Amino acid sequence: MKDSCITVMAMALLSGFFFFAPASSYNLDVRGARSFSPPRAGRHFGYRVLQVGNGVIVGAPGEGNSTGSLYQCQSGTGHCLPVTLRGSNYTSKYLGMTLATDPTDGSILACDPGLSRTCDQNTYLSGLCYLFRQNLQGPMLQGRPGFQECIKGNVDLVFLFDGSMSLQPDEFQKILDFMKDVMKKLSNTSYQFAAVQFSTSYKTEFDFSDYVKRKDPDALLKHVKHMLLLTNTFGAINYVATEVFREELGARPDATKVLIIITDGEATDSGNIDAAKDIIRYIIGIGKHFQTKESQETLHKFASKPASEFVKILDTFEKLKDLFTELQKKIYVIEGTSKQDLTSFNMELSSSGISADLSRGHAVVGAVGAKDWAGGFLDLKADLQDDTFIGNEPLTPEVRAGYLGYTVTWLPSRQKTSLLASGAPRYQHMGRVLLFQEPQGGGHWSQVQTIHGTQIGSYFGGELCGVDVDQDGETELLLIGAPLFYGEQRGGRVFIYQRRQLGFEEVSELQGDPGYPLGRFGEAITALTDINGDGLVDVAVGAPLEEQGAVYIFNGRHGGLSPQPSQRIEGTQVLSGIQWFGRSIHGVKDLEGDGLADVAVGAESQMIVLSSRPVVDMVTLMSFSPAEIPVHEVECSYSTSNKMKEGVNITICFQIKSLIPQFQGRLVANLTYTLQLDGHRTRRRGLFPGGRHELRRNIAVTTSMSCTDFSFHFPVCVQDLISPINVSLNFSLWEEEGTPRDQRAQGKDIPPILRPSLHSETWEIPFEKNCGEDKKCEANLRVSFSPARSRALRLTAFASLSVELSLSNLEEDAYWVQLDLHFPPGLSFRKVEMLKPHSQIPVSCEELPEESRLLSRALSCNVSSPIFKAGHSVALQMMFNTLVNSSWGDSVELHANVTCNNEDSDLLEDNSATTIIPILYPINILIQDQEDSTLYVSFTPKGPKIHQVKHMYQVRIQPSIHDHNIPTLEAVVGVPQPPSEGPITHQWSVQMEPPVPCHYEDLERLPDAAEPCLPGALFRCPVVFRQEILVQVIGTLELVGEIEASSMFSLCSSLSISFNSSKHFHLYGSNASLAQVVMKVDVVYEKQMLYLYVLSGIGGLLLLLLIFIVLYKVGFFKRNLKEKMEAGRGVPNGIPAEDSEQLASGQEAGDPGCLKPLHEKDSESGGGKD
């Protein structure tokens, strides 16, 4: 089966420079890679690699003047020797480009697609193939598939040259020199020549017979004379067709007729050239007469079609001497082809052997150059001496240059016949792959399926590989490489097609690492043997331009391949300075004889052998003592000391198991493992010695069981006594740096590698359950709401709500008790408190994410986590804040539900409870009595008998955010009781602004002296809800009798706003919505007092007279104080003279009573002087 992609040597290889970290190393040994590079093998050593027996055949195509070679490399010796081609008579320049082996008998087919030879100075390319037996020592067969014999096609060519007068002698001579040059260069070919000069007439200078007799161009044209007349081109062409191409003049009936016309001007005659329709006509126009497009088009009528191929315009005669090279190409097309198809090749450039494959002794080779590079493949006979060509059917123009046969690969089957896939990577620039059915009983090949590429220039079909995944003899997968595919910064793609009943169908694809747009992933694809021991074939894909090259390993799986590589090997990992690593790959043999598969990888001037490592599985066992952890030993207890609790002993055992049955060597694995306690928890429940949560150890493991003991203890307090303690084990292979990988140095101790599965194990140590003899705890939970602490929820800016819940466990221990509380979105959870018992029973709540804010919110509480013991009861208080802006109804409904992990479904009836709390909306009403209310009224016998009074009230209603719930309001106006007796009567009415009708209601209440302001009647008035309302209580007071005695009493009115108190409440208390006006009424009694006034006047006059007489008698009216004071003003400095003193003394004697105070003053002054 074909093992790797074939690449044309001329294809340029470009490398990109990108960085990518190495992939995991499963399971090829990179560090133990062995390199082979024989001296003088050339840079293309490693172009193809093929494992045969216990060695590797390496192809080294030639470069420059060197020839290609085959080398046989032995892994045991480390040397490569060239393969001797005994009996070969050919020089193989590109031997080693193609290698294939037959998996049934190990025979080897090596081909050189560049066997070249010259035929009439034209180069033919075909193939040269050698068939070897497995040991390369047996008889060798050689063959030349697609070999095309040099069949000389007969061509009779006539030069028809212009001899008109417009030609100068030197120009005419250059035409003759051109004809001589052509004849000399084609002298040893199957061409015959004749020459005719034309002007007004026509002259045969020499015919075909003359040329056969004497093939000397100089002698044949020695006596030519320039005619110097007109240019009758039409007549000249007809003359050649009828008079020159004649058998009696040497023309051959089987020869192709060719006419080359050389002229410097337009025709001077007219007509047609129907006689020359079977002649291939080239016309060469020379000179200044053909500078315009119109003049050039006059030549088209003389030439064959298409004119672009058969008309040539030259501006000077000097360019005639350089025209032969172009003319030779056109002549080459003619020679050896049929007259019906003058522009195609058959097998002349077949390059047969560019690809090859062998299966069940049946060999095929690709022939990309056949049929004008439409391509195809050759079915070789057993002796390689005969072949059958199979190509595109039908052979249409669009299949040309498709390169069918660039790759070929057998797709074996358990049936008698198999399929063959052949790639055409350049078909319509998209590429395609054709599937052919092998002929049965000497029949014909048949095309059964076509698979098309999808991206221009991707070289889809540039590499093919069939894969028998389960090794049952039936090819399940066809891998098609597109190494130039580009997408997502990845260069190259491999498409996976799976076999169906009617053909192959695309199922997936493989990709290389990103960052290598020119990496050519898929340049080489090969089906490896089972290298990882799972019984399925693995696949290697080369990407030679990812950095210095890379090889990807894809493991087989049932029904296909793993989409992710198990290993990516970079060339620099195996050898410094390597280039094109991964250009070819083959890995189906055990070269070392150790039972492990080896993979050969080609690079530039290198061949690398990578050994696979034995794949092992790790068997682990773990045991504990005690098997269950006693709860009473580790549970939280506040009466015990802080001493460490008893621990658990662990025994862990390891043993390796080989997954490669044929490997018989000794297995020793250096294992690194980690033990971890409760690794998924932040708070661990077990500690290794030293307070650590994990242990790391190394151990050498063999195929025998190895065991180790450990122990761990518990912290002071373990709260979670339900979930088992997890003991996790993680392990991996550990290799010391510098560990030798040379198996010859290590003997049979080849370092194994673990199977790429989850390298971890987890065990659980359960806690002992105190649930009776059946070891099964059955809880019975009950939840109920206690009488609400808040009888109603009053919606204010800072309102809160508290509810109480009672939770009980009536049966055995309950595990992971969870209390869920659903409440409306207007409430916001604040906190939870444990009311009773006052012990360390943990409770924690968290609000769950809202599923829909329009429905409800939920609270989840863990109670006594993790165990709620049997017979326990708790009382919880849940406190909520209110979100005033929320939408509220008439009540708040809270629903509680309690669950646990071990309650029977038949006991869930009392696990739910619901409470409903009414909602009261706030009303902000303020009532004030006005200053202009009548507060005092007085009645007198002579005063007005009727008084009009007013009691004024102002009602302010503040807007609320709950205006959607506006209550029905009513103003209740109380007026005084009607008098039962007395002279004063009163009547009352109510007016409101805005006006509303009021209903009068008599309370029929008797007057009560102790409660004088109790209303005797009520006015009930509906209130229009607005911010300000004015209420006037108007009264008429009338004096209807005589005032017999004075009195004073009070008349009171009142105003209050009433509403439905079951839905609303006063925001600032009921007093704010109540006002009262108290008015004092004064009744004054007046008696008849005229005679009393007369007698009082007379008595007053008599008293005044008596006072006057008394004053007169005492001399009050005779005093001369005025004169004395005026006399005193005449004394200087205010000091009386001596005469004055005497006068004063006399006066004092006459008026002792009036002057005594003055004398006392003087005596005091005098005394002061003494």
UniProtKB/Swiss-Prot annotation:
Taxonomic source organism: Homo sapiens (Human)
Family membership noted in the UniProt record: Belongs to the integrin alpha chain family.
Residues listed as glycosylation sites in the UniProt record: N65, N89, N188, N649, N670, N726, N730, N862, N885, N897, N1060, N1071
Binding site for Ca(2+) 1: D468, D470, D472, E476
Binding positions for Ca(2+) 3 per the UniProt entry: D590, D594, D598
Annotated transmembrane regions: 1091-1111
Ranges of residues in domain VWFA: 156-327
Biased composition (Basic and acidic residues): 1157-1170
Name of the protein described by the UniProt record: Integrin alpha-L
Compartmental location: Cell membrane
Pfam family, one: FG-GAP
Gene Ontology, cellular component aspect: cell surface; external side of plasma membrane; extracellular exosome; integrin alphaL-beta2 complex; integrin complex; membrane; plasma membrane; specific granule membrane
GO molecular-function terms, A-Z: cell adhesion molecule binding; ICAM-3 receptor activity; integrin binding; metal ion binding
Positions of FG-GAP repeats: 31-82, 83-141, 338-389, 390-445, 446-506, 507-563, 567-627
Listed GO biological process terms: cell adhesion; cell adhesion mediated by integrin; cell-cell adhesion; cell-matrix adhesion; heterophilic cell-cell adhesion via plasma membrane cell adhesion molecules; inflammatory response; integrin-mediated signaling pathway; leukocyte cell-cell adhesion
Protein keywords: Calcium, Cell adhesion, Cell membrane, Disulfide bond, Glycoprotein, Host-virus interaction, Integrin, Magnesium, Membrane, Metal-binding, Phagocytosis, Phosphoprotein, Receptor, Repeat, Signal, Transmembrane, Transmembrane helix
Motif GFFKR motif: positions: 1115-1119
Summary of subunit composition and partner proteins: Heterodimer of an alpha and a beta subunit. The ITGAL alpha subunit associates with the ITGB2 beta subunit. Interacts with THBD. Interacts with CD226. (Microbial infection) Interacts with SARS-CoV Orf7a protein.
Region (Disordered): 1128-1170
